[in-house]
A protein has these predicted regions:
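Cofactor-binding loop segments of dinucleotide-utilizing enzymes, especially the Rossmann-like FAD-
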Residues: 9, 142, 183
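Short aromatic-enriched loop/helix-cap "lid" or pocket-rim segments at secondary-structure transitions
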Residues: 49-55, 151-153, 192-194
Length: 210
């Protein structure tokens, strides 16, 4: 069975533009693919370990080929459990609001914890190889201001570290089939509603053939 993993990145549950667009995407996806399974991963409900102590020691033990202690092995198993949904899924949908030019710290925390050698990537003398190759991703980017629209008063190339980061990370772990859906000006009242409506329509169209 084809599985979709929806990673919900917004903590603003009632008013989130990224959640609204993702919900529209998923509704259209379900209609087009009724036999596919959709799983939701809300990073705000996810217990994640600090990457220190035993986990950090386990990382370097793995890099050096040293056997793990019992404590290190337990810490590493927790990391592998957090990464398991990404291996089990065939497709990903990310809802990513812009926070301080980048992504929410909870999403960054998850990425930092699970992006480990032999978990999401491998490397040898020829370079890095992502372990999620063959999967595809759709990413909904929500921004309060206009970063890509004509007349934007933000220098997008400098201020937008949201989309470049997500696409770099996805490619690093092997996901090269990436579709981006951008909803901007979410703080702009009526203008923001126009942008949100456009993004919802775009999401529905993309979802039908995703």
């Amino acid at each position: 069975m084809t599985r979709v993993l929806y990673i919900e990145g917004s903590s603003n549950k009632a008013y989130s533009a990224s959640i609204e667009v993702c919900d529209a995407f998923l509704d259209a996806y379900r209609q087009a693919h009724p036999d596919h399974e959709i799983r939701k991963l809300d990073i705000w409900d996810l217990a994640m370990p600090e990457f220190d102590g035993a986990a950090l020691a386990a990382k370097y033990a793995g890099l050096s080929g040293t056997a793990l202690t019992q404590e290190q092995a337990a810490a590493w198993q927790q990391i592998e459990r957090l990464a398991a949904p990404f291996h089990e899924a065939d497709k990903f949908l990310f809802g990513v609001p812009l926070w301080n030019f980048s992504i929410p710290y909870k999403l960054k925390h998850l990425i930092d914890v699970i992006s480990q050698k032999d978990v999401l990537f491998t490397f040898d003398g020829t370079g890095f190889t992502g372990k999620l190759a063959g999967k595809k991703a759709a990413v909904v980017y929500a921004r309060g201001l206009a970063y890509q629209s004509p007349g934007s008063f933000t220098p997008a190339a400098e201020f937008d570290l949201q989309r470049p980061y997500m696409e770099t990370w996805l490619k690093f772990v092997g996901v090269t089939d990436i579709t981006g859906i951008v909803v901007e000006r979410t703080l702009f009242g009526p203008d923001g509603k126009v942008d949100r409506s456009r993004a919802i329509d775009e999401a529905r169209t993309i979802a039908r053939t995703f």
